[in-house]
Amino acid sequence: MAGGGQVVLRTLSQQGWVRGSGAAVLSRLQDAAVVRPGFLSTAEEETLSRELEPELRRRRYEYDHWDAAIHGFRETEKSRWSEASRAILRRVQAAAFGPGQTLLSSVHVLDLEPQGYIKPHVDSIKFCGSTIAGLSLLSPSVMRLVHTQEPGEWLELLLEPGSLYILRGSARYDFSHEILRDEESFFGERRIPRGRRISVICRSLPEGMGPGEPGQLPPAC
C-alpha cells in the first residue's frame, strides 16, 4: 500500500493476516475487520466447492456489474444447501453474528476469475445490515480497506483459502473495501498470486426488511 507513515502488522500464529497504516486504525478496527485463518478444514472447503461448482458452471463470467464495482465475475444467491454445508453456515453464524442479529435467508456466492477483481466501494445499507461474513475458497487474495475521508488510513486483510473474514459497522460504512487484482496482489512485500476465487457471504438483515424479502445483489466481497 502506497503512502507514508508507520505500517503496523498484527500477527497470529507467527504469520501476519492483518496490516495497517498505523496503530490507531488497527485499534479502531480490531473488532470490526477480523480474519480467522483456517476456519474451514480441507474437507469443508471441498464440500462447499463441490456443491457450488455445478451451479456456477452454468453461468458466464461478466465484466459489467450493475454498479461497476466488480470485473470478471459470476454470482448467485443461494438459499438451499446440503446438510453438510448448512452445518458450516451455522458455524459462520455463531462466529460472526450476535444473538440478536437475523441473517438474510439467501447467501451471496461470488466467483471471481483469476483476472477478476472488486473495485473500492462502500456497501449500501439497502442490501444488508451491519455485519457481513465471508468464507474464501480456492485462491488467496488481499482485501484492502481505505477510510473514505482520510485515505491515509488503511487496512489490508490476507484472505487465504479456508479463512473467514468479518466486516462490521465502521469497517463497512466508513471504509471502502476491494479485492486487489492479480498484478496488485501484494501483502506488504509478499506477492499473493491470484487464481480463481469463490467467496460465500452471509449477511445480516437490513433494518426494516423481512428475512424472506428479495433484494438486488449487493457488491459484496
From Swiss-Prot:
Gene name as annotated: ALKBH7
GO cellular component, one term: mitochondrial matrix
Protein EC: 1.14.11.-
Enzyme class name: oxidoreductase
Keywords: Dioxygenase, Iron, Metal-binding, Mitochondrion, Necrosis, Oxidoreductase, Transit peptide
Main location: mitochondrion
Binding, 2-oxoglutarate: Y165, R197, I198, S199, R203
Feature: transit peptide: 1-23
Family: Belongs to the alkB family.
Cofactor requirements of the protein: Fe(2+)
GO-annotated molecular function: dioxygenase activity; metal ion binding
Superkingdom classification of source: Eukaryota
Protein name as it appears in the record: Alpha-ketoglutarate-dependent dioxygenase alkB homolog 7, mitochondrial
Species annotation: Bos taurus
GO annotation, biological process: DNA damage response; fatty acid metabolic process; regulation of lipid storage; regulation of mitochondrial membrane permeability involved in programmed necrotic cell death
Annotated Fe cation binding sites: H121, D123, H177
Cofactor note: Binds 1 Fe(2+) ion per subunit.
Coiled-coil intervals, chain numbering: none
PANTHER family hit by this protein: ALPHA-KETOGLUTARATE-DEPENDENT DIOXYGENASE ALKB HOMOLOG 7, MITOCHONDRIAL, SPERMATOGENESIS ASSOCIATED 11-RELATED
Cellular localisation: Mitochondrion matrix
Function statement: May function as protein hydroxylase; can catalyze auto-hydroxylation at Leu-110 (in vitro), but this activity may be due to the absence of the true substrate. Required to induce programmed necrosis in response to DNA damage caused by cytotoxic alkylating agents. Acts by triggering the collapse of mitochondrial membrane potential and loss of mitochondrial function that leads to energy depletion and cell death. ALKBH7-mediated necrosis is probably required to prevent the accumulation of cells with DNA damage. Does not display DNA demethylase activity. Involved in fatty acid metabolism.
